[in-house]
Amino acid sequence: MNRIKAVGYENNELKEKAQLLADQLNLQLDQNADTCLFVTPEKLTLKIRNFSLMFADFSAMTWSKRRGEGKKQGLIRACKPTKGIKIFDATAGWGKDAAILATFGADVLMLERHPVMAALLADALSRRNEADIQKMCLSLIASDAISFLHSLQEKDYPDIIYIDPMHPERNKSALVKKEMQVLQQLIGTDYDAMELIKLSLSHVKSRVVVKWPQKVKPLLPPDASIDGKTVRFDIYMPQFSSN
């Protein structure tokens, strides 16, 4: 499964909605496809052979349960998300790290360049109720992070840019979750990760945080690192930062 080529739908009442999405993403409409973006009455999902339906979820109920344990996570220790802090998640993926950061009060903008993943994230955002929106400040721009940063004015620089590049080593472990397996196959390796890190350092106020496999050499020597069991969080400080 290298790429999604079709949009499917659960029943004929959803055909028009599926067709609109297929046209938007330049995909085929195929109700019988076994690998596709799949429209159900409740949500947009990813249908992959031998997997259950997968979808993004930004309900406050789901993520508030993880907030307590999140305080001990390297992600939180590295990014230090608090109310009023502006964070760009430059490689949003399924949006899970972005959601965790948002539960701590940060204003998180997700950037996702893969159209299929961006569609899944957008659908998850659209399903939120008012309580979800109040508790988690999340937004999305379907864009390549490098292009987006190039277009950014200095007054709009975020406090933190978080980067979780797709790395081949991440897919070799039997412990890799199904969502990461699918993301790896769908997106592939982020070969422009070095370029993104360097560009981020000139477009951020406080720090750049990179999630990277624990035993793999960093792309750039970090100013600090927070180690986990299988990954670490490398921290890079821009030269002009006062933090």
Swiss-Prot record:
Coiled coil: none annotated. Keywords: Cytoplasm, Methyltransferase, rRNA processing, S-adenosyl-L-methionine, Transferase. It is found in: Cytoplasm. It catalyses: guanosine(1516) in 16S rRNA + S-adenosyl-L-methionine = N(2)-methylguanosine(1516) in 16S rRNA + S-adenosyl-L-homocysteine + H(+). Its EC number is 2.1.1.242. S-adenosyl-L-methionine binds at E112, R113, D164. GO terms for molecular function: rRNA (guanine-N2-)-methyltransferase activity. Its main location: cytoplasm. Transmembrane segments: none annotated. InterPro entries: 16SrRNA_methylTrfase_J (IPR007536), SAM-dependent_MTases_sf (IPR029063). SUPFAM superfamilies: S-adenosyl-L-methionine-dependent methyltransferases (SSF53335). It holds the Pfam family SAM_MT. GO terms for cellular component: cytoplasm. Specifically methylates the guanosine in position 1516 of 16S rRNA. Belongs to the methyltransferase superfamily. RsmJ family. This is Ribosomal RNA small subunit methyltransferase J. It comes from Legionella pneumophila (strain Paris).
